[in-house]
Amino acid sequence: MKKLTKISTALLIAGLGFSFAASAKVTVFAAASMTDALQQVAKDYAKQNPKNEVVFSFASSSTLAKQVEEGAPADIFVSASNKWMKYLSEKDLTVKETEKVLVGNDLVLIAPAKSAVNSVDIAKGEWINALKDSYLSVGDPAHVPAGQYAEEALTKLNLWDKVKDRLARGKDVRGALALVERAEAPYGIVYSTDAKVSQQVKTVAVFPADSHKPVVYPVSIVKGHDNADSRDFLKYLESDAAKKVLVGYGFSAK
């Protein structure tokens, strides 16, 4: 399982010279594209709930969903697509009354920050020529939501057949981002929020909204983990304060 990223109260307030022992812990399995935003939300939550602790496991939604299916101790699941939430829901592994869409996102084409290209007409497909002997960096369309959205969009634009054999397939969307950050790929397809948090890439095009299903992030409490602490953090996730943070990171409010 992915190493859990811990947001601990002691670390958050160490600068003030004192700490509290956590009396409750909520484990959140969340799509990799939400890493920065959810960590900030958890920090803000900890300020209001100093005796609570939130820990994260960030990875591809498909990887996390299958870990939940295998019994991983997740209290809350945040997916980057309806597909993987539905996957767990149909297996009766979610608390259905808590299922809802948290935020949305956009799909974008990125290039290294130092690239001479600043914008492209995504529909014309001339940008594909710049790949030359290199690859287009994407989350693996076989299981990564960002890659599946990318395949859908490129198919709609009649470009998929031109690039399907020239893909660098990341294990998640942050893996796809990393290749472009290191300039190991001239272009990549990620979410707008991923591009926004990186100074090593720039957005050169936004895929038309009608070229793919809406990018949404459903959230739910995992069955067997419906308790007061899980409910409390989920309620905070849906609060105006949390939504403000998420929107600040580039997500769209729902």
From Swiss-Prot:
Residues 1-24 form the signal peptide. SUPFAM superfamilies: Periplasmic binding protein-like II. InterPro entries: ModA, ModA/WtpA. One of its GO terms (biological process) is molybdate ion transport. One of its GO terms (molecular function) is molybdate ion binding. Keywords: Metal-binding, Molybdenum, Periplasm, Signal, Transport, Tungsten. The keyword Metal-binding applies. GO terms for cellular component: outer membrane-bounded periplasmic space. The complex is composed of two ATP-binding proteins (ModC), two transmembrane proteins (ModB) and a solute-binding protein (ModA). Belongs to the bacterial solute-binding protein ModA family. This is Molybdate-binding protein ModA.
